[in-house]
């Protein structure tokens, strides 16, 4: 069996090596020619999977090691009887941790307390739902907007207009062009122009959900709007001027914990095994190394807010990835695009909060609750 796979999918050989011959390629370069004699295709979000890619190939199963599947023509796969799996929820915790890190660092830089802010979440799917729960447990007032879920009967949802009045707006929608609730340029020029100077905007879903030209024009005014972008139009050839105007600009790595990325590999491995009628022989724990930061300890007298922010930034500080991307923006256009992909391909080992054990010596209940809210693994002595 021949398996063609995006070279950025981790642990390909340990999970799939016994199934067949693996051929790896940069995800953006996978073409119809590469798939003529392939049986299985494994991708990430940078590969558009449709009739043009798969026509006259032998591909019988497509696995996408990603939460979303906007890049896959599911109707075409169904019409051809091609099996499919993505990995819903695989990196949801990682994206939540990215947003929490942004808020932690911004609270210090801009001088505010988290519990004094309201947060508007646009899209209450797997990621948005987890973020809502975490921020609520941290004491923030959270309002979520998700019209499809509201139409399906979910409760405690708010209108887009209400959510856009929150101090912090964070985007977690799929990219859709059709249906009752299209999300392409959901934040259009009018909405962007009406954002308050004291608001914070974070986007970790899809770049096309925002009108980037309008956002760049707004930021060029320099009136105080704070923006953190991890996703962009036309990746990897992103808008340099917009990136330089962002408070934080990162190369589509919000979900890139080792745990989240490898969980995606494990999920599509499990689905392919079942599709082929094979036993599921491997588990993720067999292959993951110990995290570089395994343990932190706080004493009973520690200030809870200080402990929270220290733990968050020690585990993941968004400023590192921001500086890495902005360092590439001085290069010429072809080299910038290559560096964007290289930063993703060679991304450092970043582990999830739940891989770090925090010991609280005589810890207070409020500190236990606070650290637990964002996913840390706790023990109290």
From Swiss-Prot:
Pathway: Cofactor biosynthesis; pyridoxine 5'-phosphate biosynthesis; pyridoxine 5'-phosphate from D-erythrose 4-phosphate: step 2/5. GO terms for cellular component: cytosol. Substrate binds at residues 45, 66, 256. GO terms for molecular function: 4-phosphoerythronate dehydrogenase activity; NAD binding; protein dimerization activity. Its EC number is 1.1.1.290. It catalyses: 4-phospho-D-erythronate + NAD(+) = (R)-3-hydroxy-2-oxo-4-phosphooxybutanoate + NADH + H(+). It is an enzyme of class 1 (oxidoreductase). InterPro entries: D-isomer_2_OHA_DH_cat_dom, D-isomer_DH_CS, D-isomer_DH_NAD-bd, Erythronate-4-P_DHase, Erythronate-4-P_DHase_dimer, NAD(P)-bd_dom_sf, PdxB_dimer_sf. SUPFAM superfamilies: Formate/glycerate dehydrogenase catalytic domain-like, NAD(P)-binding Rossmann-fold domains. The active site is at residues 206, 235, 252. Belongs to the D-isomer specific 2-hydroxyacid dehydrogenase family. PdxB subfamily. PANTHER family: FORMATE DEHYDROGENASE 1 (PTHR42938:SF9). Catalyzes the oxidation of erythronate-4-phosphate to 3-hydroxy-2-oxo-4-phosphonooxybutanoate. HAMAP family: PdxB. This is Erythronate-4-phosphate dehydrogenase. It comes from Hahella chejuensis (strain KCTC 2396). The lineage of its organism: Bacteria, Pseudomonadati, Pseudomonadota, Gammaproteobacteria, Oceanospirillales.
